[in-house]
Amino acid sequence: EFRRQGHLMIDFLADYYRKVENYPVRSQVSPGYLREILPESAPYNPESLETILQDVQTKIIPGITHWQSPNFFAYFPSSGSTAGFLGEMLSTGFNVVGFNWMVSPAATELENVVTDWFGKMLQLPKSFLFSGGGGGVLQGTTCEAILCTLVAARDKNLRQHGMDNIGKLVVYCSDQTHSALQKAAKIAGIDPKNFRAIETSKSSNFKLCPKRLESAILYDLQNGLIPLYLCATVGTTSSTTVDPLPALTEVAKKYKLWVHVDAAYAGSACICPEFRQYLDGVENADSFSLNAHKWFLTTLDCCCLWVRDPSALIKSLSTYPEFLKNNASETNKVVDYKDWQIMLSRRFRALKLWFVLRSYGVGQLREFIRGHVGMAKYFEGLVGMDNRFEVVAPRLFSMVCFRIKPSAMIGKNDEDEVNEINRKLLESVNDS
């Protein structure tokens, strides 16, 4: 019966992908639609898979925004692949809970291996790899990765300055940094007044300025505060700009800040030699993360985090109650990933990434990235040939930022009016 139902499910998904281009990309339903058409209570008696899938087709799919549609261009991609789906299926089927090495050695050791593989593809410094004293871990999202490293940085600093100084710790980023950092800072107990989102400008292509960073640090030091943590970005959400890592890390190290590099979207591109330059300076960072579920054909969720000093994470995140004690952990020769993350339980994420790496290989993965960049470059050229539009930020990867030119709007010279016209264009595209 399991085999029969499995075939039904694969056929259902295959049919969905065959037709996905025909669905409206954005769901057309109204808020609360589903509660109105589903029963008020769960069924008392079992229902067949056929009946359930029929409801998926008629009630669930109309409420889905189809992220895998070829017509979906919003946000960063959530790329999937056959290899990713199958790896996820196997992981779910095994249903192991790999919180430490003993409960599923293969889950832990495969994660060790694939994060080292991926790190080598990115030409990360050896100090970020298990083979060089560092190591990688697969988290759910960048939010988790940033929170874990921020907590590690916080505790390392407070062990030196005293726990009562948590209110003096300061976190730095640009006004283009992902909001994940702000959320992590709140959870980690950083005083909201000590969160520095340093202003960027169009003249610098919205990069974080090292001089402004140093000025902010000096100002805080003069006021008795303790600079703690810098988050630099490779591929910002708004424009995919790249912060100048070499100069920023030089400033940060001068004042003993923990440096995290968030490359959630654009990091995957750096497996291509022509994009690796954007990671120059990462050798001076303390941690680095990217989301394989964004641009690396790996299904959600799969955030890869590398750290130079795993002991900093472990000191902050480890717990060792009686029921978790075992001989393998006590040897200190194995990795217990529960001590590298927020949760205790964890999924076998490494399987799907392993499937992707093996099914496509480095060569095809590079061509996949280059294909997307090539399409973006082509679109950028089309925008450039139309005098009604302008590209407003340099295209570095596969995202193009453009708008209607103010000069194309008769009598519309006020910036607010220009923005409103462009907002209406955006809304009309999304409604189409």
UniProtKB/Swiss-Prot annotation:
Q: Which family does it belong to?
A: Belongs to the group II decarboxylase family.
Record EC number: 4.1.1.25
What is the catalytic activity of this protein?
Answer: L-tyrosine + H(+) = tyramine + CO2
Q: Which GO terms describe its biological process?
A: amino acid metabolic process; carboxylic acid metabolic process
Kindly state one GO CC term assigned in the UniProt record. cytoplasm
At what positions is N6-(pyridoxal phosphate)lysine found?
K294
Assigned keywords, A-Z: Decarboxylase, Lyase, Pyridoxal phosphate
Coiled coil regions, renumbered to chain? none
Gene that encodes the chain: TYRDC-1
Cofactor(s) listed in the protein's UniProt record:
pyridoxal 5'-phosphate
Q: Which CDD domains match?
A: DOPA_deC_like
- For this entry, the protein name equals Tyrosine decarboxylase 1
Q: Which GO terms describe its molecular function?
A: pyridoxal phosphate binding; tyrosine decarboxylase activity
